[in-house]
Curated annotation (Swiss-Prot):
The gene is GP16. Its main location: host cell. This is Glycoprotein GP16. Glycosylated. Keywords: Glycoprotein, Host cytoplasm, Late protein. It is found in: Host cytoplasm. One of its GO terms (cellular component) is host cell cytoplasm.
Length: 106
């Protein structure tokens, strides 16, 4: 056996013989309980913060999706209006004898 194993066994034997082992274990237990409660509190705070950020992110993504849908609808409506106006102008130009040869000018 190495030195530290022998030392540890002797220390535990002494603590058992002197009656201090139970007290030492209770102190270690109380320290571990305090550490656990502190870690649980911090973990709960982190989870709450992540949850609030997740909620905010989903709200922003939902707003972005709604704005995108409205923008595309407006683009489609305006595109149809522009197309209709272009057709009406072409009909009027054709009726009045004005030929649109802008690209064919020599």
């Amino acid at each position: 056996m190495n030195f530290w194993a022998t030392f540890s066994i002797c220390l535990v034997g002494y603590l058992v013989y002197a009656g201090h082992l139970n007290n030492e274990l209770q102190e270690i237990k109380s320290i571990l309980v305090v550490m656990y409660e502190s870690m649980e509190k911090h973990f709960s705070n982190v989870v709450d913060e992540i949850d609030s950020l997740k909620t905010d992110t989903f709200m922003m993504l939902s707003n972005l999706q709604n704005n995108t849908i409205r923008t595309w609808d407006a683009v489609v409506k305006n595109g149809k209006k522009i197309s209709n106006l272009d057709e009406k102008i072409n009909v009027l130009l054709t009726k009045n004898g004005v030929v649109n040869n802008v690209l064919n000018v020599q």
